[in-house]
């Protein structure tokens, strides 16, 4: 979860726990909720953002991102999740994040025609995946790879706020998208460096590895 107090697990638990119990009673599983939330989030991002409906797209994506958090609450109510569920949730998060940046990239590239902003968006798209991969690959090797400025909640807050404010009804501020995207791009690159440094300083990180055989590749 985020380091921000108002995005803490405890803060959301007050809202999500009763809803999670209700969903479990009607027979839904955490994995089904994960897939439904991701599907809706991706559909909203890839439909509304390319049409230039940035405020509506930001609201839809944010709603279903919050909806997707119900799967964790449901798993806790059932006494714990499964390893497959954890992998599915992480995979769907990457798909959802990718859809957000791809939808915005389409609008920026083909309608705004802002080349510098295209570059910033591409940086955000790539680093959003790399940040998560560094942690996953490090933990698979028994090392630490967490921390850094930007985690998923902060990433979504920055990009969705920038998109929404740039197209806000009645009082839009168009530069907000560019400001948010460049801020996120810089912070994301720094986070990649921070996480790599965390991996490098982990115990055993520079120990030599056995050379894999042909059958291991």
From Swiss-Prot:
Enzyme class: transferase
Binding-site residues, a CDP-1,2-diacyl-sn-glycerol: 31-34, 72, 76, 82
Effect of residue 133 to F: No change in catalytic activity
Result of changing residue 90 to Y: Large decrease in catalytic activity
Membrane topology of this protein: Multi-pass membrane protein
UniProt-annotated binding residues for Mg(2+) 2: 68, 89, 93
Pathway membership: Phospholipid metabolism; phosphatidylinositol phosphate biosynthesis
Keyword Phosphoprotein applies: no
Keyword hit for Hydrolase: no
Free-text comment on the cofactor: Contains a di-nuclear catalytic Mg(2+) center.
Keyword terms, alphabetized: Cell membrane, Lipid biosynthesis, Lipid metabolism, Magnesium, Membrane, Metal-binding, Phospholipid biosynthesis, Phospholipid metabolism, Transferase, Transmembrane, Transmembrane helix
Subcellular location: Cell membrane
Phenotype upon changing residue 94 to K: Large decrease in catalytic activity
Quaternary state and interactors: Homodimer.
Additional observations: M.tuberculosis PgsA1 has been identified as a promising candidate for drug development because of its vital role in growth and proliferation of the pathogen as well as the differences between eukaryotic and mycobacterial PI biosynthesis pathways.
Protein name as catalogued: Phosphatidylinositol phosphate synthase
Organism whose genome encodes this protein: Mycobacterium tuberculosis (strain ATCC 25618 / H37Rv)
Origin organism lineage: Bacteria, Bacillati, Actinomycetota, Actinomycetes, Mycobacteriales
